Amino acid sequence: MIPVVIEQTSRGERSYDIYSRLLKDRIIMLTGPVEDNMANSVIAQLLFLDAQDNTKDIYLYVNTPGGSVSAGLAIVDTMNFIKADVQTIVMGMAASMGTVIASSGTKGKRFMLPNAEYMIHQPMGGTGGGTQQTDMAIAAEHLLKTRHRLEKILAQNAGKTIKQIHKDAERDYWMSAEETLAYGFIDEIMENNELK
């Protein structure tokens, strides 16, 4: 069930679902697994807010375990495509593809709440049962290319070398807010709506 907010206006009462009300304040919620439907909704909101006023920041709140690489990269590409700055605020966690999205916010405007976590790792893939050897080789090559592309984005976002990202992402690499700040994925830690 999605909560409803009722506001008093000069014309009377107006009710909004909570996400529409947040959108009115240029806030987008990116929560749950990254998949095509969620990505399409986030992309549509980014495009709408940019078309409405590209001189005002967009606030993207992130709490996701990650998910689809293609859906996540569609969000990242849109964030980079639009003119409005995108502030990212991580609450809960930004893991896997969520880290790529959250760290792709406008430099200087990437934030994290004090008890949130970041996690990077190499992309996962599979071929399913009954796959021919040739198809398995194609899938493996694609997975390696995808890993390199994600490592390049993460390296740019954190100011690290691709080699360092490759090493750290070999296995699940969890970071606290302080560790994420030191690593370079965020610019500041937010506490009580103020920067730390």
Swiss-Prot record:
Alphabetic keyword roster? Cytoplasm, Hydrolase, Protease, Serine protease
Give the top-rank taxon of the lineage listed in the UniProt record for this protein.
Answer: Bacteria
Q: Where in the cell is it found?
A: Cytoplasm
**What is annotated as the active site?**
96, 121
- In short, the EC number is 3.4.21.92
Single GO MF descriptor: ATP-dependent peptidase activity
> Record's InterPro entries?
ClpP, ClpP/crotonase-like_dom_sf, ClpP/TepA, ClpP_His_AS, ClpP_Ser_AS
GO cellular component terms, A-Z? cytoplasm; endopeptidase Clp complex
Which reaction equation describes what this protein catalyses?
A: Hydrolysis of proteins to small peptides in the presence of ATP and magnesium. alpha-casein is the usual test substrate. In the absence of ATP, only oligopeptides shorter than five residues are hydrolyzed (such as succinyl-Leu-Tyr-|-NHMec, and Leu-Tyr-Leu-|-Tyr-Trp, in which cleavage of the -Tyr-|-Leu- and -Tyr-|-Trp bonds also occurs)
PROSITE patterns noted in UniProt = CLP_PROTEASE_HIS (PS00382), CLP_PROTEASE_SER (PS00381)
Does the record bear ATP-binding in its keywords?
no
Q: Name a single GO biological process.
A: protein quality control for misfolded or incompletely synthesized proteins
* Primary location recorded for the protein, binned into one broad class: cytoplasm
Q: Does the keyword Hydrolase apply?
A: yes
What does the sequence similarity comment in the record state about its family? Answer: Belongs to the peptidase S14 family.
Binding partners and assembly: Fourteen ClpP subunits assemble into 2 heptameric rings which stack back to back to give a disk-like structure with a central cavity, resembling the structure of eukaryotic proteasomes.
Task of the protein:
Cleaves peptides in various proteins in a process that requires ATP hydrolysis. Has a chymotrypsin-like activity. Plays a major role in the degradation of misfolded proteins.
What is this protein called in UniProt?
ATP-dependent Clp protease proteolytic subunit
- Which gene codes for it? clpP
